[in-house]
């Protein structure tokens, strides 16, 4: 995250210095006066779980840890201008994600390591309030915050696992999001690199009686996304 912020600020500063020195023309001068505009988003996500184990963890369970994995996002941007420095953004997104839960189990003879993989296909609807700085030449910084509804189309909550002992999680979630980015005004469109982090509100664990689920008291989503919007 620190590298992303440093790089973005460096690019913005370099752009402004170049513009001041060479008198670069202002791109899209009336862009921010539009009441609404559209675009698309591509990005990568990194998700894992915040895990809280039960207080009386069974003797056969030594360790439970979450391992973050990378995924892909594709979305459609709808941006509504509220006033000069505030926008409302709605970005329906298809998100392909994967998470792993690592267990160390004791069978009275050996310690066994097990990875339980959870693959998800999310339909996400984030609604964010975007606050923009003043525009400097062809760039401006912004921060945003909001909530996101997430529906997992690949949820295995209600399926019969046929003895495979998969970790089942609930199908939907609500998350809090906060992020930052920079708008770059190019000759024909606006390009914006953006970093967001999110935290789930719901406990997603489904206790089906297996050792993998009954050892977990709470399972909440957390992660971050690096995305690029073209508007």
Regions found by a protein language model. Give the residues of each.
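Short glycine/proline- and aromatic-enriched beta-strand/turn motifs that initiate or cap beta-hairpins
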Residues: 20-70, 231
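Outer-membrane beta-barrel strand-turn architecture
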Residues: 32, 80-84, 133-137, 184-186, ...
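Residues that define the transmembrane beta-barrel architecture of outer-membrane proteins
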Residues: 34-36, 68-72, 119-123, 139, ...
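Transmembrane beta-strands of outer-membrane beta-barrel proteins
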Residues: 36-42, 88-92, 123-125, 141-147, ...
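Transmembrane beta-strands of outer-membrane beta-barrel pores
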Residues: 44-48, 94-98, 133, 147-153, ...
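Repeated loop/turn-to-beta-strand initiation elements of outer-membrane beta-barrel proteins
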Residues: 48, 85-88, 137, 188-191
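Flexible, solvent-exposed loop segments that connect beta-strands
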Residues: 52-66, 98-120, 153-169, 205-217
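Predominantly the C-terminal beta-signal and adjacent terminal strand-loop region
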Residues: 171-173, 181-231
